[in-house]
């Protein structure tokens, strides 16, 4: 029978956050990996430090920070400013914009490292949850397969029982027909014997008179 045990209650209400499509995963990666948290959001996730415990998980609340792509934005602005200064012939401003682009790229690299460190524990919890979820789905699939096999086995037993019942009925009818035929034959033989006995008696009487 399939297990009715739900997933950890600490994950209830946030399942959609973990079961993501490709676009959601891409968006989350872009937000988490290269960026440094600049503020706090009000979105709160309740995570279990030990997801395998499905009955009494202890919970802790983690506040996910709101992040922005400052390095990417600054790099883009520096390139746009450099392009405009080149068209305007302002070489000094062009040099400043290129230096700003280098600084922005350095900031982006630092943001990638810092963001990766910041989200490391969250990624571990996510992988742990995904492992539990995959194991739960595999278990449910296996139990459903076993249930289907059991249902087919019961159906096969029922069909076999019906065939045996029909065969017994047919054998019973054949036996009853045989008894009727035997009784009829016995009656015919008895009648023939009686007839022969009467004929013999009549013959004896006739021959006795002579």
Swiss-Prot record:
Q: Which stretches does UniProt call biased (Basic and acidic residues)?
A: 157-172
Membrane topology category: Multi-pass membrane protein
The Gene Ontology biological process terms listed for this entry are:
mitochondrial respirasome assembly
A cellular-component GO term for this protein: mitochondrial membrane
PROSITE patterns, from UniProt? HIG1
Carries keyword Transmembrane helix? Answer: yes
Q: Which InterPro entries match?
A: Hypoxia_induced_domain, RCF1
Q: Does the keyword Transmembrane helix apply?
A: yes
HIG1 domain sequence ranges: 7-130
Major location, coarse class? mitochondrion
Q: Which domain of life is it from?
A: Eukaryota
Cite the Gene3D superfamilies for this sequence.
Answer: 6.10.140.1320
Q: Where are the transmembrane segments?
A: 66-82, 102-119
Where is the protein found, in the record's own terms? Mitochondrion membrane
Recorded coiled-coil stretches: 138-171
Record PANTHER family: HIG1 DOMAIN FAMILY MEMBER 1A, HYPOXIA-INDUCBILE GENE 1 HIG1 -RELATED
Give the protein family: Belongs to the RCF1 family.
Query: Could you identify this protein by its name?
Result: Respiratory supercomplex factor 1, mitochondrial
Q: Which gene encodes it?
A: rcf1
